Amino acid sequence: DRGAAWTAAIMGVPARTVIVLGAPDCAAMVHRVAALCADPVEEVRLERKSPLAAAASPVKLADLGRGDALIAFSRREVLSLRAALMARGRSVACVYGALSPEVRRAEARRFREGQADILVATDAIGMGLNFGPLRRVVFSALAKWDGREQRPLSVQDIKQIGGRAGRFGHQDE
């Protein structure tokens, strides 16, 4: 979806070394862009060191706990879920794309420092903020509006967002 933006970012960055982190299926694109610039590419593949698994059954709001992230796909849904959790006495941090970078960072810090038990966020969660240890990532839906249509989440969407949970060296349990 964001090929042009990635190409511009990779080709336009004024740096001697560019490190691109991504899913294995983006490697071919990185090689093609680098070839256009006659730049060398060193590809390093890493394996996830902690398992990522789907839950056997849906998770209820009442079963969310400290360190959980609940992912929604609209600001309206994020705010609705936040209100429902707060009505249950839970402390909640929220992150979605329309928030300013400063507010997103502040909310991430509140969650990371334990001032909020649960994080409710859009898929902006996968875009570079440090939330600290996420116990698990729970999806409120398995489809999202992509700007043109409502579509099922792809395996890559789920891996990118869900992969924020249980990162090696970040879990106490």
Model-derived regions: residue spans:
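Conserved catalytic network of the ASCE P-loop NTPase/AAA+ motor domain
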Residues: 11-15, 60-64, 86-87, 110-113, ...
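C-terminal helicase lobe
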Residues: 50-71, 77, 147-148, 155-173
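Conserved ATPase-coupling elements of RecA-like P-loop NTPase cores
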Residues: 1-6, 81, 129-133
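Post-DEXD/H (motif II) to motif III coupling segment of the RecA-like Helicase ATP-binding lobe
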Residues: 2-47
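Conserved RecA-like helicase motor core of SF1/SF2 enzymes
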Residues: 89, 97-101, 105, 112-170
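Conserved nucleotide-binding/hydrolysis micro-motifs of P-loop NTPases
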Residues: 15, 24-28, 48-53, 75-78, ...
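Conserved strand-helix element at the start of the C-terminal RecA-like helicase core
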Residues: 19-22, 26-27, 64-88, 92-96
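Short glycine-/polar-rich loops that comprise or flank the Walker A/P-loop
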Residues: 13-17, 37-41, 65-67, 88-92, ...
